């Protein structure tokens, strides 16, 4: 098995190299010459869509979109990765992050940011989200200044109020 993670972050020379590998199951290494696989490996390629991957390379791949987890799946991930965060805090922050993903952002927060945010909030002894805490830790979730500027302040407070109202009315089992 061969994992090529974040292909879109490589240069075109690497894509050409990979194209040779996927076309003929062989590679050319200047110091060693041409090497051919005895058995074609299973190749998994990931991309974060930071740039377009060459069409010739995409034609040799099966495409599978992996969407963000739903609320319960992301909560389960946090239960494993941030066990010190309280159940109510985890429910609030997962719901908040999922609302952020629905906004028109340059880069929506991924699961890694959800985990990082939970761990940061634990370090800050946070037991429940409030607008000030959300604003002061927004940089853990959003990685572009335009996104932060768009969400911080009244928009973050509005999203948080929605989260809190939904969690109260839905009686989501968070434990």
Residue ranges and their predicted role:
Residues 1-175:
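C-terminal regulatory/interaction module of P-loop NTP-utilizing enzymes
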């Amino acid at each position: 098995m061969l994992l090529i993670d974040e292909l879109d972050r490589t240069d075109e020379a690497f894509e050409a190299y990979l194209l040779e590998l996927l076309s003929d199951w062989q590679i050319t290494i200047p110091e060693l010459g041409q090497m051919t696989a005895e058995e074609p490996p299973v190749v998994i390629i990931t991309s974060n869509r930071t740039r377009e991957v060459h069409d010739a390379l995409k034609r040799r791949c099966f495409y599978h979109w992996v969407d963000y987890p739903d609320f319960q799946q992301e909560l389960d991930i946090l239960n494993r990765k941030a066990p010190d965060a309280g159940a109510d805090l985890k429910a609030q922050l997962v719901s908040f992050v999922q609302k952020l993903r629905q906004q028109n952002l340059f880069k929506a927060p991924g699961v890694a940011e959800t985990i990082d945010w939970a761990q940061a909030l634990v370090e800050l002894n946070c037991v429940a989200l409030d607008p000030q805490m959300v604003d002061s830790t927004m940089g853990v979730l959003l990685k572009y200044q335009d996104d932060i500027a768009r969400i911080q302040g009244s928009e973050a407070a509005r999203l948080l109020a929605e989260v809190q109202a939904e969690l109260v009315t839905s009686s989501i089992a968070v434990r």
